[in-house]
């Protein structure tokens, strides 16, 4: 995998490499795939797009777009808030974008990927009433007691083999604390992400040395159930209001993966 300052990419990845790549960056960065695929839509109607070269775009808010080599509009798309799932079946990489209300499913069967790109897009000119996960992280670094008394955040966007940890820190008992941040209602996929990160740290440091906390304004019923089953925690926290521009310099200075003093 090649890395630039804000861009991570793979050229002609294997199915396994692509699976790991999407697992690491989906819902965090903008994903762009240049791929050969078939597309199936089922919802208010049914449609099928035969195999061809397409540009697939998955945005952090769940928006899913498929472009051909002509025209401005995507040939298929799903709105923000859609769930994204993926699997490997008979050597095909399958992406699904699922919208629950109204019920719609966009299924992309990928036979070949020429290029996969993850772009860390930070648009500070945009004014949001609801802040991004980056702004949530900045807010937590400024006031760690929002999570709990004695919490010490150490690193943001800490990369491990199973993904990118939003915030890594320690509690007052010196246990590792992994925070998964969601600016909207957290679903099953958010819990699954957190579970993978916690399992990695438990394998490294021990079962009783690691905690995982999902931080978001609310939870789906399924997410709440899975959190309890996996002995993970939930902290209700709304993202900050205001301009991303105001936090531009603070956000950049807080990003670090230097943990030598803690490890």
UniProtKB/Swiss-Prot annotation:
Example of a GO cellular component annotation carried by this entry: cytoplasm
Gene name in the database record: nucS
Keyword Nuclease: yes
Single Gene Ontology MF annotation: DNA binding
Keywords assigned: Cytoplasm, DNA-binding, Endonuclease, Hydrolase, Nuclease
Protein's job: Cleaves both 3' and 5' ssDNA extremities of branched DNA structures.
Origin superkingdom: Archaea
Enzyme Commission number: 3.1.-.-
Name the record gives this protein: Endonuclease NucS
Chief location: cytoplasm
CDD domains: NucS-like
Subcellular localization, as worded in the UniProt entry: Cytoplasm
């Amino acid at each position: 995998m090649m890395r630039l300052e804000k861009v991570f990419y793979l050229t002609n990845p294997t199915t396994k490499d692509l699976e790991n790549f999407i697992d690491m960056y989906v819902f965090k960065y903008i994903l762009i795939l240049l791929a050969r695929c078939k597309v199936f839509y089922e919802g208010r109607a049914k449609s099928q797009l035969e195999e061809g070269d397409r540009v697939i775009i998955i945005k952090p808010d769940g928006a899913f777009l498929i472009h051909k080599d002509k025209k401005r509009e995507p040939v298929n798309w799903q709105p923000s808030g859609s769930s994204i799932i993926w699997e490997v079946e008979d050597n095909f990489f399958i992406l699904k974008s699922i919208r629950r209300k109204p019920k719609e499913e966009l299924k992309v069967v990928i036979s070949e990927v020429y290029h996969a790109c993850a772009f860390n897009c930070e648009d500070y000119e945009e004014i949001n009433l609801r802040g991004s996960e980056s702004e949530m992280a900045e807010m937590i670094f400024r006031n760690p007691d929002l999570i709990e008394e004695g919490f010490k955040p150490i690193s943001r966007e800490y990369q491990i083999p199973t993904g990118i940890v939003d915030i890594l820190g320690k509690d007052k008992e010196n246990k590792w604390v992994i925070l998964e941040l969601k600016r909207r209602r957290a679903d099953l996929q958010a819990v699954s992400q957190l579970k993978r990160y916690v399992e990695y740290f438990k394998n490294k440091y021990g079962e009783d040395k690691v905690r995982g906390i999902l931080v978001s304004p609310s939870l789906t019923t399924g997410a709440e159930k899975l959190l309890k089953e996996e002995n993970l925690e939930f902290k209700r926290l709304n993202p900050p209001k205001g301009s991303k521009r105001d936090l531009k310099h603070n956000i950049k200075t807080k990003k670090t993966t230097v943990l030598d003093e803690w490890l």
